[in-house]
């Protein structure tokens, strides 16, 4: 059963410049779709959409839920050599219809309970904002 995170939107800005990044985007997106009833916006900024051509067919094949239920993919064509992540995030926030917005990195998967505990804390007004940082290798 998927956990209810329906009042949240994961925003994931991407530029897929390597096979590793493609694998990570597919893995994280499938993880979110399979485990949570939530909203997801992925915006790819690049000359051509690698996500649409290579990731979407795989996701449609491997994910057992309707991926399009609360999922929005946006491709913005750009010849810009640099990826302006913050600008893309600002654009994506404007697309959100939920009060809770999760700036999500496509290279990260946390334990499922981390998502549900954070969501509950925000919904119960215990937290206004949460930030996850990975522990230092020295810790």
Enumerate the predicted regions with their spans.
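Acidic donor-binding segment of Leloir-type glycosyltransferases
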Residues: 31-75
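Short beta-strand-to-loop acidic/aromatic patch adjacent to the donor-nucleotide binding site
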Residues: 99-109
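Alpha-helical elements of Rossmann-like donor-binding domains used by nucleotide-donor carbohydrate transfer enzymes
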Residues: 27-31, 87, 91, 117-118
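Short acidic, S/G/P-rich loop/turn micro-motifs used as interaction or catalytic elements
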Residues: 15-20, 47-49, 107-110
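Glycine-rich, basic loop-to-helix element that forms the pyrophosphate-binding segment
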Residues: 79-95
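Conserved small/polar residues in nucleotide/adenosyl-binding loops
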Residues: 132-139
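Conserved donor-nucleotide/metal-binding helix-loop-beta segment in metal-dependent transferases, i.e.
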Residues: 115-129
């Amino acid at each position: 059963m998927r956990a209810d995170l329906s009042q949240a939107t994961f925003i994931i800005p991407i530029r897929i410049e390597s096979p590793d990044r493609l694998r990570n985007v597919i893995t994280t997106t499938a993880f979110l779709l399979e485990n949570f009833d939530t909203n997801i916006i992925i915006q790819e900024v690049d000359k051509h959409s690698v996500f649409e051509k290579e990731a979407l067919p795989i996701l449609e094949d491997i994910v057992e839920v309707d991926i399009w239920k609360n999922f929005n993919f946006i491709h913005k064509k750009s010849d810009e050599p640099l990826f302006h992540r913050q600008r893309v995030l600002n654009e994506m926030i404007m697309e959100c219809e939920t009060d809770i917005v999760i700036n999500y990195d496509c290279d990260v998967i946390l334990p499922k309970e981390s998502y549900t505990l954070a969501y509950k804390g925000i919904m119960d007004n215990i937290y206004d904002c949460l930030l996850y940082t990975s522990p230092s290798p020295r810790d």
